[in-house]
């Protein structure tokens, strides 16, 4: 495979396609794993769980998590506060 073949790898991933693992999400957002697991346990987010595999998140979920993490980290909103904001 030459360089032009490698550079031509171009494809679309739908915004709702679950492709990001928990580890990748945490690394991209700078979010501790325990926060992500808490949000899942509290039903604030609902990742896809393929049989016996890690949780997977879509770009849409990543955007939602980014907003949630901003509120938690910068505005000091608690998990219960996030629930009130999202589910009122």
Each predicted region: which residue ranges?
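Key DNA-contact positions within bacterial/archaeal DNA-binding proteins
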Residues: 34
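Arg/Lys-rich, alpha-helical DNA-contact motif
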Residues: 1-29, 37, 41-47, 51, ...
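Conserved catalytic core of two-component sensor histidine kinases, primarily the HATPase_c ATP-binding
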Residues: 54
């Amino acid at each position: 495979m030459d360089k032009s073949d490698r550079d031509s790898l171009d494809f679309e991933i739908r915004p709702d396609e679950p492709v990001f693992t928990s580890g990748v999400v945490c690394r991209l957002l700078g979010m501790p794993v325990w926060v992500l697991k808490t949000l899942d346990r509290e039903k604030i987010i609902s990742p896809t769980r393929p049989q016996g595999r890690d949780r997977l998140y879509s770009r849409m979920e990543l955007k939602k998590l980014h907003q949630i993490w901003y509120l938690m980290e910068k505005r000091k909103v608690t998990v219960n506060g996030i629930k009130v904001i999202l589910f009122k």
